[in-house]
Amino acid sequence: YYRDNHKQKEDDNTVVLNVDSTLETLSVDPERIKSAILEHTTRAAENYEYPNSFSLDIPFVSQYPELPTGCEITSLTEVLNYLGYGIDKETLARNYLDMRDTVTQGCFVEYFWGSPWKTTGSGCFAPAIANAANSFLKSQNSSYSAYIMSYSPVEDLFTELSLGHPVIVWTSYNYNDPDVKYNDVTLDDGTVFTWPRNEHCAALSGYDIDRGVVTLADPTYGIVERSMEEFVTYYQKYYYQAVVVR
């Protein structure tokens, strides 16, 4: 699984995250990662208290064998299937996911670098998947829309889920490796982008506060439980990336 090709380094054009810092002290240009806007609006319902446990029956869709590096678009396929759309992962990737072969400005954020059909494909972040989702939903004249939730606290992810809104989250491909490593990728405009190895994506389908677990519809591993502590740690280390469809 080739999620270990790419990262970023510090100079005048660098976009770097200190993964050991808190959200408030992240050393990053947030507009770059958030694609200029944070669209999440759950905080408008401040009086809402999410329950201690909740789950949605989001189906498992395997990314294999067709999309060995297509966990992001496959996670979106799971969510759209849950919402009643019979779209398959390859059609979604082929027609709605913006992909580029070269390292140009916006790499990993606005589009998928490489091809999800190839083991040498790299990946993408929340804006690329939100854009793919909205392109598809618009083509269906759907009342649903996708919203970027990046940098939202985990509690907001649970709030959205408990309101019946499926959430896509970025996490680690390898929960046995707590030390996330990073590679440097120099974009065509000179910006150096930090890419986390083992970057992975899944649909958040449930949580249980009392048991300390979350449930993921994971395109690689199936319907799996992860400890709350591990989930939160990797959510932070993979730049707090998330998308909600509602």
Describe the role of every protein-language-model region:
Residues G70, A146-I148, V167-T171, A203, ...:
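Structural recognition of the beta-strand scaffold that forms the well-ordered cores
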Residues N183-P196, A202-R246:
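Noncatalytic regulatory segments and standalone regulatory/sensor domains
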Residues Y1-A132, Y173-Y175, K181-V185, V192-W195:
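Active-site-adjacent structural segments surrounding the nucleophilic cysteine of cysteine proteases
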Residues E155-D156, N176-K181, I223-E225:
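Short, surface-exposed beta-strand/loop "edge" segments at domain boundaries and coil↔beta transitions
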Residues P116-E155, T159-L163:
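Mid-length scaffold segments of soluble, non-membrane domains
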Residues F158-V167, T171-D179:
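Short, solvent-exposed, low-complexity loop/linker segments
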Residues Q140-Y144, L163-I168, R211-G212, Y240:
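Loop/turn elements at helix/coil->beta-strand transitions in domains of secreted/extracellular proteins
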Residues S75, S150-S152, T171-Y175, G206-D208, ...:
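A mature extracytoplasmic/lumenal domain signature
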